[in-house]
From Swiss-Prot:
InterPro entries: CB, DNA_brk_join_enz, Integrase-like_cat_sf, Integrase_catalytic, Integrase_recombinase_N, Integrase_SAM-like_N, Recomb_XerD, Tyrosine_recombinase_XerC/XerD. The keyword Cell cycle applies. It comes from Roseiflexus sp. (strain RS-1). It holds the Pfam family Phage_integrase. Forms a cyclic heterotetrameric complex composed of two molecules of XerC and two molecules of XerD. CDD domains: INT_XerDC_C. Site-specific tyrosine recombinase, which acts by catalyzing the cutting and rejoining of the recombining DNA molecules. The XerC-XerD complex is essential to convert dimers of the bacterial chromosome into monomers to permit their segregation at cell division. It also contributes to the segregational stability of plasmids. The active site is at R147, K171, H243, R246, H269, Y278 (o-(3'-phospho-dna)-tyrosine intermediate). This is Tyrosine recombinase XerC. GO terms for biological process: cell division; chromosome segregation; DNA transposition. It comes from the Bacteria. The keyword Cell division applies.
Length: 313
């Protein structure tokens, strides 16, 4: 049974060009499902029945998995059996009459503009090479709304400080070129001109990565998460996740009057409905101040002047 799971995962990588993190999530979901049906004495995938699928969903609910997790597990199983059916490995699809569970969709959590300002000022209170790097990363995240996975994948050649743009590669290899504001450009210039070379001394060979760790290697998502956790503790915040900066960018842009379609392109969303969820968040503390924030006004000005560079095909 594991051989067919591996074949499916290779299909996701080679044919559908899914990201490594997405494939890892599929593996986790299918490993749990495989353990479940094996415990029910199913030795071949053709032995799995409609009742097995329903029992798996009940199993997840009884263990109080979040509705989003149940929905993801079921979606992974449905995709897997569609693959098996299409390849002729099973005669019928036991998930065919299974409805995807409804997901209780929580609104994204965003920081207020005041909290963003405090976060962006924290690194320079003790300007070490690492914290100057942190300043550049945080400014860039808030200025562009890019994902952390996109941030840590940036190379030196992706930054164009002359034209104030950054080129990032998103999900499914989609490339977009984003404008950056003056605050982010200044922070990046300071980092690239001074701090990066100090961090690079820890590396045995030249490296293209834009953001380096203290050993001179490319900073990882996990490394960034630990950095952000440190700043959250310094601010006294109960929780601060990397994605909250992306949420904050979107909410503050829309509250300041930015066009929904422009924000969709900046975020790299394929569907406008994904971006629309941010219109339901309107912090009383962020509706007005964001208009007078130099950082936010500058970004919003880029949008209003239609300086957004279209996503490359």
């Amino acid at each position: 049974m594991n051989d067919q799971v591996e074949a499916f995962l290779r299909h996701l990588a080679d044919e559908r060009n899914l990201a490594a993190n997405t494939i890892a999530a599929y593996r986790t979901d299918l490993d749990q499902f495989c353990d479940f049906v094996s415990a029910r004495n199913r030795r071949e995938w053709r032995d799995v029945s409609h009742d097995d699928i329903l029992s798996f969903m009940l199993y997840l609910r009884e263990r109080r998995y979040a509705s989003s997790t149940v929905a993801r597990r079921v979606a992974a199983v449905k995709s897997f059996f569609a693959f098996l059916t299409g390849s002729g490995a099973v005669p019928h699809d036991p998930t065919e009459r299974i409805d995807s569970p409804k997901v209780d969709r929580d609104l994204p959590r965003a920081l207020t503009p005041h909290q963003v300002d405090e976060l962006l000022e924290l690194p320079l209170r003790s300007p070490t090479p690492e914290r100057i790097r942190d300043k550049a990363m945080l400014e860039l995240l808030y200025a562009t709304g890019m994902r952390v996975s996109e941030l840590v994948a940036l190379n030196m050649t992706d930054i164009d400080l002359v034209h104030s743009t950054v080129r990032c590669t998103g999900k499914n290899g989609r490339v977009r070129v984003l404008p950056i504001n003056g605050s982010a450009a200044t922070a990046l210039e300071e980092y690239c001109d001074n701090s990066r070379s100090q961090l690079a001394r820890g590396s045995d060979a030249p490296i293209d990565a834009l953001f380096l760790n203290h050993r001179g290697k490319r900073l990882t998502r996990q490394g960034f998460w630990l950095i952000l956790k440190q700043y959250a503790e310094e601010m006294g915040l109960g929780e601060l996740t990397p994605h909250m900066l992306r949420h904050s960018f979107a909410v503050h842009m829309l509250n300041a009057g930015a066009d929904l379609r422009a924000v969709q392109e900046l975020l790299g969303h394929t569907s406008i409905s994904t971006t629309q969820i941010y219109t339901h968040i309107n912090h009383a503390s962020s509706a007005q101040p964001v208009r007078s924030e130099p950082r936010a006004t500058e970004v919003n000005g880029v949008i209003n002047e239609q300086a957004l560079v279209p996503e490359e095909k």
